[in-house]
Curated annotation (Swiss-Prot):
It comes from Gallus gallus. Belongs to the ashwin family. This is Ashwin. Residues 1-21, 82-102, 212-241 are annotated as: Disordered. It is found in: Nucleus. InterPro entries: Ashwin. GO terms for biological process: anterior/posterior pattern specification; convergent extension involved in gastrulation; embryonic morphogenesis; regulation of apoptotic process; Spemann organizer formation at the dorsal lip of the blastopore. Its main location: nucleus.
Amino acid sequence: MAAQGRGRVGGGKEERVSARSDSELLLHPELLSEEFLLLTLEQKNILVKNDVKMDKDGLTDLYIQHAIPLPQRDLPKSRWGKMMEKKRKQNEPKSENKSVTAVGGLRKRPLIVFDGSSTSTSIKVKKTENGATDRLKPPPAGSITNTVRRLSAPSNASTYISASSLSEDAKLEVRNNEAKQNNISKTNSSVLVNLKTHPLSPVAGTTVVKLKRSVPKDESDLPNDLKPTEAKKKIQHCTWP
């Protein structure tokens, strides 16, 4: 039994030594063959030009740049080190599964190919039989009658009347109102003219008071707007009853 136990221990040590030797070989690509280097580069999705025959030196340079494993710190043989080794072993298959699922999801989606013609396409507009575009079509005939228009009404009345509902009687009333307004304005203007030509005469028994404005001595001090002009030489005095 003791011999079998020793044999098992010896076999385990040999396996560990072989695993370490393989990992050490990955850190020294000069010892690897060209075929192995090509396989590792293809697994890492690193393109190698088929036209150009690369030497082993070129493959080793690519391997060192992209595919060489990163250095990792050796864990101590304590309880914490054993726990970290277990976590690493558990995380390795998870990361592989995630990468596989991501690649599968990308493959399920259809590939989008952009052609040169798609960027330089011109905008197409549908044309009618007459050659005019749909945007420039006139409005339908039914909408013209229903439009809202503002009529020339007196200043007091600020209402909107639709052209369709307006009758002839309403039009006549509007015209009569305009004529009345014109007559009122004419009478007001005639009254003002009469007042200017015939000023009010003073009533008997009342005193006439003349209002005088104080004019400065120097006319140069006055502004241009307040200076007397030739047309306004006579000042009309106001008479109070």
